[in-house]
Each structure stands twice: as structure tokens, then as C-alpha cells.
Amino acid sequence: MSELIVNVINGPNLGRLGRREPAVYGGTTHDELVALIEREAAELGLKAVVRQSDSEAQLLDWIHQAADAAEPVILNAGGLTHTSVALRDACAELSAPLIEVHISNVHAREEFRRHSYLSPIATGVIVGLGIQGYLLALRYLAEHVGT
């Protein structure tokens, strides 16, 4: 059996990890996060395809590709979580699991961050555990979707 491909998609501003609000998002850069995710995925027998874009259109394209391939998605949509019906509709097409991840505890922050268009259609939501949230999502997928 071939290894399961997991799409890890990061939205707007996540390319600035380590520089943007490190007190909220931590000091790990996006490049360091990618290496960590790829290493963890390999140890779990998964192949992580990690992407980041500040463009909503690009995120939609990647979600559509995952939907067409029936591949799971770990998604940190950043601020689009709270605003994008288009992203929600694209994610609704996924037949494989969707895990919504947020580095910070969005429920302990501003009121507008507490609403997610994605949570009602996600398989699971991991918030406030820092970058460990991505690794927990990978472990879940390895165990429940599996290799």
C-alpha cells in the first residue's frame, strides 16, 4: 500500500511565523514548521505536502485538488477561517478528513476570532496547542485513515 498523502495548508500570514506576534504564535518559523511536519509525517508512514499562501484563490485550488484526489487536509486558514464562505464551500467537497488547526487559542482572543466557517464541516478542530496541533492532526490521520 502506498503512503497516505496529507495536505497541510496554511493560509494568510502564516508564512510570517516566527516574526509575526511571536508571543501569540511562537518563535518557530514556517520553514522550521514545514521540516517538523515532514519529519513527523515520515515517522508515521505518511507523506505531508505542506503549502502556504496569502491568496484565497490559491488555497481554494489546493483544497479542490485534495478533494479530487480524496486526500485528507490539515488546514490552518488563518484569518480566512472567520470570513471565507468560499473556503468553507470548497472544504465541504472533501470526502477525506479535514482537520482545522489554529496555533493560538482563538476562543481566548478577540470576539471575531471565535467564529469559524470551517468548524461545522471539519472532522476535528485543534486550537491553542501551538505547532503541536499539526503533529496531533498527523497522528490522528495516521491512526484513523492510516497507512
Curated annotation (Swiss-Prot):
Entry GO CC: cytosol
Checking InterPro entries in the record gives:
DHquinase_II (IPR001874), DHquinase_II_CS (IPR018509), DHquinase_II_sf (IPR036441)
Q: Which PROSITE patterns does the entry link to?
A: DEHYDROQUINASE_II
Q: Which residues form the active site?
A: Y25, H102
For this protein, the Enzyme Commission number is 4.2.1.10
User: Is Phosphoprotein given among the entry's keywords?
Assistant: no
Pathway where this protein functions: Metabolic intermediate biosynthesis; chorismate biosynthesis; chorismate from D-erythrose 4-phosphate and phosphoenolpyruvate: step 3/7
Q: Could you say which residues bind substrate here?
A: N76, H82, D89, I103, S104, R113
> Coiled coil located at which positions?
none
Q: Show which residues form the site (Transition state stabilizer).
A: R20
Gene3D superfamilies, per database record:
Dehydroquinase, class II
GO molecular-function terms, A-Z: 3-dehydroquinate dehydratase activity
UniProt GO BP: amino acid biosynthetic process; aromatic amino acid family biosynthetic process; chorismate biosynthetic process; quinate catabolic process
- Recite the UniProt keywords alphabetically: Amino-acid biosynthesis, Aromatic amino acid biosynthesis, Lyase
Q: Which reaction does it catalyse?
A: 3-dehydroquinate = 3-dehydroshikimate + H2O
- Misc note: Was identified as a high-confidence drug target.
The entry's family comment says: Belongs to the type-II 3-dehydroquinase family.
Stored PANTHER family: CATABOLIC 3-DEHYDROQUINASE
Q: Quote the function comment for this protein.
A: Catalyzes a trans-dehydration via an enolate intermediate.
Q: How does it assemble?
A: Homododecamer.
| Protein known as | 3-dehydroquinate dehydratase
Q: Which organism is it from?
A: Mycobacterium tuberculosis (strain ATCC 25618 / H37Rv)
